Amino acid sequence: IAPTQEGGIYYTGPSDDFSRPGRMWWSVPEGVTEFDTWRELTTVYHEGVPGHHLQIGQATANRGQLNSWRRVLAGSSGHAEGWALYAERLMQQLGYLDDPADRLGMLDGQRMRAARVVLDIGVHLGKPRLNGEEGIWDADYALEFMMRNVNMAEAFVRFEVNRYLGWPGQAP
C-alpha cells in the first residue's frame, strides 16, 4: 500500500460502460506499518458489497432509466450513506459480524459516525462550542472534538475532519 499523508477508505464507481470497474481504495498514512483489522470489516461492507459498490453499480447498470441530472447531480448523501449503513447492519444480522472483535468494530464505526454528525452540524451552522466553551466550531475545535470522541489515529482523524469541512451534509 502506498503511503499518504492522511489515510482513509473510500469507493469510486465504475465507468458508464463498465470498462473500468468500481474500486475500494484503502490509503494508509505514511509511517503506519500496522493497523487493526477488527474495525475494518464493517467498513469493507460499507464501501464494498453490499454497500456503495452495489448501490453505485446498480445506478450505473440502470443508467438508461435515469437522466444525467438524476445520475450525476442529484445524488444524496442521505441515500448513499443510508444505504451503506443499512448494508453494515444487514451483514451483522446475517451473521457476518458474529466475531466479537468485528462487532466491536461496527460499534466503533457507529460511534465515529455519531461524532461526525455533531461536527458537521457544529461547523457548518456555526454553532457554539460544547460544554460552555467560548467561541464557535472551527477546524481546530473540530479536530479536538473528534480526537476526544473517536478511537482513531490522529492522521486518520485529520483526513476525516478535512473531508467533513469540505463536504457539508456528508456525515449521516
Q: Which residues are covered by each model-predicted region?
A:
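Long, His/Glu/Asp-enriched segments that create or flank divalent metal/ion-associated functional microenvironments
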Residues: 1-172
